[in-house]
């Protein structure tokens, strides 16, 4: 029985071992703007802390966790590999979410492309309705999390969703995310999350969102 269990564990970790055999370190991406460029919507101080401290921590933790996972898998320690999954999801999700978030923002974000605007009108009635619905569900997130506009490739429609903590968006291609962890706004907006969420639309990078939409439809 023990030998059978060991063989099963070995088979389970072998595919992961192959993936981890060639690996590289994750790095903190540069911002596509200066820290002060999004003022007055988001202050220089918030942007610098958010990027250099919070996102950097997710990246550093992710690299450390992947090293531990590699070690566990190489030793055939399935129990340890499984135990690392929550931390991998949290820090990996934090890195993924923030890497999208930075590109979603711009001082002069323009307007949605014609194709995206037509789809917004089809699926939500109007851009105003989309903004209101996404804002409402994002403001209502309990604790920390994200609000997302995504594209469902299966149904070929735009959808909105929320994710707790740093869980990455699943079942859709992420187009635009709103970070409602307090570190994203508290120094400036205090506990008035609605003001922050409503204001962030002023710096939505519609060029980036439209490009993501076009790529998702391919």
Curated annotation (Swiss-Prot):
GO annotation, biological process: removal of superoxide radicals
Assembly with partners or alone: Homotetramer.
Compartment(s) where it occurs, according to its Swiss-Prot or TrEMBL record: Mitochondrion
Required cofactor(s): Mn(2+)
Task of the protein: Destroys superoxide anion radicals which are normally produced within the cells and which are toxic to biological systems.
Protein name as catalogued: Superoxide dismutase [Mn] 2, mitochondrial
Catalytic activity annotation: 2 superoxide + 2 H(+) = H2O2 + O2
Entry note: cofactor: Binds 1 Mn(2+) ion per subunit.
Superkingdom as given in the UniProt entry: Eukaryota
Gene from which the chain derives: sod-3
Family, similarity comment: Belongs to the iron/manganese superoxide dismutase family.
Residues reported to bind Mn(2+): 50, 98, 179, 183
Transmembrane segments: none
Main location per the UniProt record: mitochondrion
Aminoacyl-tRNA synthetase found in the keyword field: no
Source organism of the structure: Caenorhabditis elegans
UniProt tissue specificity: Expressed in pharynx and rectum. Upon thermal stress, expressed in vulva, body wall muscles and hypodermis.
Lineage, highest ranks first: Eukaryota, Metazoa, Ecdysozoa, Nematoda, Chromadorea
One GO MF term: superoxide dismutase activity
GO cellular component terms, A-Z: mitochondrion; respiratory chain complex
Transit peptide limits: 1-24
């Amino acid at each position: 029985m023990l030998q059978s269990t060991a063989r099963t564990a070995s088979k389970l970790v072998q595919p992961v071992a192959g993936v981890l055999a060639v690996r590289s370190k994750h790095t903190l991406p540069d911002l596509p703007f200066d820290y002060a460029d999004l003022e007055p919507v988001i202050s220089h101080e918030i942007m610098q802390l958010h990027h250099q401290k919070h996102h950097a921590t997710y990246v550093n933790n992710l690299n450390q966790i992947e090293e531990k996972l590699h070690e566990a898998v190489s030793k055939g320690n399935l129990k340890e590999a499984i135990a690392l999954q929550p931390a991998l999801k949290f820090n990996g999700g934090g890195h993924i979410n923030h890497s999208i978030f930075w590109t979603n923002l711009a001082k002069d974000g323009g307007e949605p492309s014609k194709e995206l605007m037509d789809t917004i009108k089809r699926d939500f009635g109007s851009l105003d309705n989309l903004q209101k619905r996404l804002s409402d569900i994002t403001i209502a997130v309990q604790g920390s999390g994200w609000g997302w506009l995504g594209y469902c490739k299966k149904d070929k429609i735009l959808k909105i969703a929320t994710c707790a903590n740093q869980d990455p968006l699943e079942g859709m291609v992420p187009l635009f995310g709103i970070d409602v962890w307090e570190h994203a706004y508290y120094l400036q907006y205090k506990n008035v999350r609605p003001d922050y969420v409503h204001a962030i639309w002023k710096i939505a990078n519609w060029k980036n969102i439209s490009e993501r939409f076009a790529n998702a439809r391919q």
